[in-house]
């Protein structure tokens, strides 16, 4: 077993060897290096053909038509293009947007920007399970609501939102529905037709493809219009200008092809490892799973646990041979408790003591068992150092204590 152990697959994934090998054929002078927009010679034609193949591979995984896939630099850009693009195009119909407090920063900060431009945004509170209450969402809809944005799988707690039901409501009321599916494609079955989704963002690097490339599904029937946020040569049907990075697109296509082929065998294996990890922790004292564990409502690769009376940062330091995250990769650089966990109603202490384990293609049973052992030791050691743990063990109600300020 090689140390450190990587259990942060929700932050990024290594590129699959098969993907890297394929990408190498699209870079040098001996490979296909042309610009797909060069329509007058063989170099451009070959590049365009490679892009078409990848576009089809990506569309296949989500049940879309290849013409509905727009390439971007990643899911953050896709979220920006979807939300700003739809809001600006449809603003004559209304300026109200609905989203959820536990969305990714790429959605929340885009909505904040639109608020500065005069749009109004309703941020829904999730239930303690992490899931959206459909009735609350429906109640928030107004005559001037033009867009609803809800992620399919949460990046921190892995819960699967009821996208199909939300899609039905939006379709019936003719409201544009955007879904950030960065953490769901290739991990759960995704079919944009069945889900009634108008816009869907996804990435390559969460699915064993290269970083720096992503996509946005833009529904053709009923047709959804967007105002571009990057202008130039009119690439991607005018929605996203810029020379297409063929090697990255080919890599993403190959990664999606492999995911479609291997998902049925890969996900049950990953689920077994996740359950093994959970079973290793579940009998410990004061250990809480964040987000629902109900079957079908959580992605198989995610386990987010709070170890009470242990500070997340010191826990991370004690796990130097295990790569996990406290909060999400985008917020783990800050010392703020996770806003996702706070939105679930967790207090600061529990939010601070959370660790996200995310399992992937190359995780082994041996690594899981070693992780359980190391984490248990670290928790025991850190709790021994904690006066709060001693007080808790003595039966003192910590919430009733008046702490004095010095």
Curated annotation (Swiss-Prot):
Catalytic activity entry? (sulfur carrier)-H + L-cysteine = (sulfur carrier)-SH + L-alanine
Q: Which residues bind [2Fe-2S] cluster?
A: 330
Q: Does the keyword Protein transport apply?
A: no
Please state the pathway this protein functions in, per its UniProt record: Cofactor biosynthesis; iron-sulfur cluster biosynthesis
List residues binding pyridoxal 5'-phosphate: 75-76, 155, 183, 203-205, 243
What is a single Pfam family found in this protein's UniProt entry? Aminotran_5
Transmembrane regions listed in the UniProt entry = none
Q: Where in the cell is it found?
A: Cytoplasm
Major place of localization?
Answer: cytoplasm
Its top-level enzyme class, in one word, is transferase
Q: Which GO terms describe its molecular function?
A: 2 iron, 2 sulfur cluster binding; cysteine desulfurase activity; metal ion binding; pyridoxal phosphate binding
Q: What is its EC number?
A: 2.8.1.7
Q: Biological process (GO) annotations?
A: [2Fe-2S] cluster assembly
Q: Which InterPro entries match?
A: Aminotrans_V_dom, Aminotrans_V_PyrdxlP_BS, Cys_deSase_IscS, Cysteine_dSase, PyrdxlP-dep_Trfase, PyrdxlP-dep_Trfase_major, PyrdxlP-dep_Trfase_small
| Residue positions of the active site | 330 (cysteine persulfide intermediate)
Which cofactors does this gene product need? pyridoxal 5'-phosphate
Q: Which family is annotated?
A: Belongs to the class-V pyridoxal-phosphate-dependent aminotransferase family. NifS/IscS subfamily.
The protein's job, in short, is: Master enzyme that delivers sulfur to a number of partners involved in Fe-S cluster assembly, tRNA modification or cofactor biosynthesis. Catalyzes the removal of elemental sulfur atoms from cysteine to produce alanine. Functions as a sulfur delivery protein for Fe-S cluster synthesis onto IscU, an Fe-S scaffold assembly protein, as well as other S acceptor proteins.
What HAMAP family does its record include? Cys_desulf_IscS
- Subunit arrangement? Homodimer. Forms a heterotetramer with IscU, interacts with other sulfur acceptors.
The molecule here is called Cysteine desulfurase IscS
Upper classification of the organism: Bacteria, Pseudomonadati, Pseudomonadota, Gammaproteobacteria, Pasteurellales
- Gene it is expressed from: iscS
